[in-house]
Amino acid sequence: MRVLVLGGGVVGVTSAYYLARAGHEVTVLDRQPGAGLETSFANAGQVSPGYSAPWAAPGIPLKAMKWLMMRHRPLVLWPQLEPRLYGWLARMLANCTQEAYQRNKGRMVRLAEFSRDALRDLRGETGIAYDHREKGTLQLFRTRKQLDHVGDDTRVLDAYGVAYEVLDPEGCIAAEPALARVRDTFVGGLRLPGDETGDAHLFTQRLAALCADRGVRFRFGVAVARLHHEAGRVTGVETATGEVLRAEAYVAAMGSYTPALLRPLGLSLPVYPVKGYSLTLPVTDEGSAPVSTVMDETYKVAITRLGDRIRVGGTAELAGFSQALRGPRRATLERSLTDLFPAGGDLSRATFWTGLRPMTPDGTPIVGATAYGNLYTNTGHGTLGWTMACGSGRMLADLITGRHPEIAHEDFAERRYRRAA
């Protein structure tokens, strides 16, 4: 079957890989000059099934109000007259109940665990290298209140058989020895030993090369303008230059830009761009740098080791599609790093980056069939695109091929939002 994949980030390229592996003739379109150059370019680097949780959770509305007042706030909301944003926020607030949180976290962990296993399988099949480490994630708590609420997450982890360790400060230092230098900064942590780290951009580029070896065609520098459709099926993709490309199946994997593409077809995807920032800097002292990923729970900042580099990622900024680099957001990332790993890297040589994470109100991606018989979506992964990419691509390839996916998939499809739309 001829399949057009729209989007060349980590989600689009993994989709192409699994489709090609299933025997399909695949073409990938992306407006950038190469693979993984937008949201996948400099994300936090975590592959974190254990940390997969919706932002919509009990207590979040009150926490959000406090965050907005912090100097180094993890959440930034720019006042703007944008009905889509306020509708999205209303849906998110509706998911801040305990029942919704347990349901959403459960399905996110289900996909993330499957995806981590799929990534390991892919690594075994291909030998792909991308500065990966299998040394877990340490969620670090600076306050006793944060530590006391860890049971909200461990109950779901128990239900899905996800390994974890609740650690005292000495246990945290055993996992991340450099933290001994800042022993008074934290009171404990939650370690997720099954988590991994890796450079999503490097992975995406190298997987694209492997896809090309399998016959996948990449057309970079091609912007998608609109979809043609007739009688409940997509009949073609029109590019910005007016060229129309045709296939038998179509995959919309354009991240935050997917809703605008599908809206003229009557499909309303509640995916909003949540802007994140990162710093990437060289390691200057091995013994003072992180071993894997440390998640600073106070500032919601992830500090990740990627080979001879440190990646510091975080902040949730609701500012539409703006990709302006803002100094205060950089200051928050620098504050977290200097608090926890003050001698680990050289901030004077850091590169500052921002990207738009495609977020749904319930935190769960939108993967699967649509109301159009040959149109599929693979978007809405939020901060977990790298974590969920392989599992989403593998699940989607099974659906397009007519095979039953290896995990329950119905609750990831676009139709869960149709009634609300």
From Swiss-Prot:
Q: Which cofactor does it need?
A: FAD
List keywords of the entry alphabetically: FAD, Flavoprotein, Oxidoreductase
> What domain of life does the UniProt record list for this protein's source?
Bacteria
Q: Does the keyword Flavoprotein apply?
A: yes
Catalysed transformations (reactions): a D-alpha-amino acid + A + H2O = a 2-oxocarboxylate + AH2 + NH4(+)
Binding locations of FAD: 3-17
GO MF annotation, one = D-amino-acid dehydrogenase activity
Q: What class of enzyme is it?
A: oxidoreductase
Task: Enumerate the Gene Ontology biological process terms.
Answer: D-alanine catabolic process
Which Gene3D superfamilies does the entry link to?
A: D-Amino Acid Oxidase, subunit A, domain 2, FAD/NAD(P)-binding domain
What EC number(s) would the UniProt record show?
Answer: 1.4.99.-
Tell me the route in metabolism or biology where this protein functions: Amino-acid degradation; D-alanine degradation; NH(3) and pyruvate from D-alanine: step 1/1
Naming one, the record's GO cellular component terms include:
cytoplasm
The record ties this protein, via PANTHER family, to: D-AMINO ACID DEHYDROGENASE, SARCOSINE DEHYDROGENASE-RELATED
> In which family does this protein belong, per the annotation?
Belongs to the DadA oxidoreductase family.
What does it do? Oxidative deamination of D-amino acids.
From the Swiss-Prot or TrEMBL record, give the protein name: D-amino acid dehydrogenase
> Species name for this entry?
Methylobacterium sp. (strain 4-46)
